[in-house]
Amino acid sequence: MIDVSMLALAGSLILAAQGAIAAEPAFVRTDRFIDLPSDERLFVREVRGRNTPPAAEQSAVLLVHGARVPGIASFDLPVPGGSLAVDLAAAGHVVYVLDLRGYGASSRPAAMDEDPSGSAPLIRTDDAVADIAAAVDAIRGWSGNNPISIVGWATGGHWAGAFAARYPEAVARLVLYNTLYDGTAEHETLGRGSPLEDPLRPGSFNASAFGGYRFNTRDSLFSAWNNSIPIADKNLWRDERVARAYGDAALVSDASSTSREPPSFRSPSGALADSFEVITGKTQWSASALVMPVLVIRSEKDFWSRPQDAEALAKEAPEAELVTIPDATHFVHLDRDDAGRAVFLSALTRFLDPSQSRPK
């Protein structure tokens, strides 16, 4: 277990240094597309320091978003404190932000242009693993790095874990951040007895209710976040500029969002089906196959993962460490520094630094 008080101090120093750096246009963003054999394509944004040495001399880090909000809205908001990609680029990494198929600027299945009820849940674990594999192959060519490190948030951690378990040789270091695992069968909002369970087929995902994809309004992004912030004035915990940019970027990620009232962006339902299966005992991968260094980060007030998930991941992965951030929310990387973000960033940058030995 890591001493979070020391991480908080280190994180404050990192953020102070980055504040000075960020006063200049110090980062370069390059948007790329990966063509797939299926005639679909994946969107990837590269973020690096303007004065970063040649890519082969740096460590490459891939960021994988979760179930609803795509990569840019999750990891590269254009406001202070809103870009994990910039945080990691400031630490010397070359960072890649991926949109899986069905999300953001990547290709969407044709079924997402039809009524959601007309298809089964779209973009399941195998689809996500294939997309991550394509991104990793492309990043190897762009960066000269092999293997690369991966950071997955929530369902992104589930998908990244599935990829790393299947292709361990491709992953240098793996970060599983607020990620579900089969730590316990109890989950009020995602498990048995929740809206995700089919009332006519107990133990099965309610595919008829969720269909192939779902619509998400701006307001829907903040209910769970607000409920987990332990103070009345949410702006004291979460910068209002970050919250506004998060909602804006999520809606802009879908060109059809303004065709509905209120505006809403589409996200595939496969992540929900995967999550229900994991919670109800249909394990899709084993942490014992994660032979690379693994960092498990869990926010104490996370509504998605359970303490048992983090503990099971850290216990089963052969070379894992666990950081629990007190009072932090599911969105800690988008909260204020003193609301856990500094601790999160310190733990992450320390772990991803290839020059540092990992604490025992």
Region locations from a protein language model:
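Catalytic histidine-centered segment of alpha/beta-hydrolase-like enzymes
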Residues: 328-342
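Alpha/beta-hydrolase
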Residues: 185, 189-292
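Conserved acidic catalytic loop of the alpha/beta-hydrolase fold
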Residues: 127-147
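Conserved hydrolase catalytic core segment
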Residues: 146-151, 155-185
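N-terminal cap/lid segment of alpha/beta-hydrolase-fold proteins
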Residues: 23-54
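Short, surface-exposed "cap/lid" segments of acyl-processing enzymes
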Residues: 53-97
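Conserved strand-to-loop "acid loop" that flanks and positions the catalytic carboxylate
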Residues: 294-301
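Conserved alpha/beta-hydrolase "acid-adjacent" motif
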Residues: 303-309
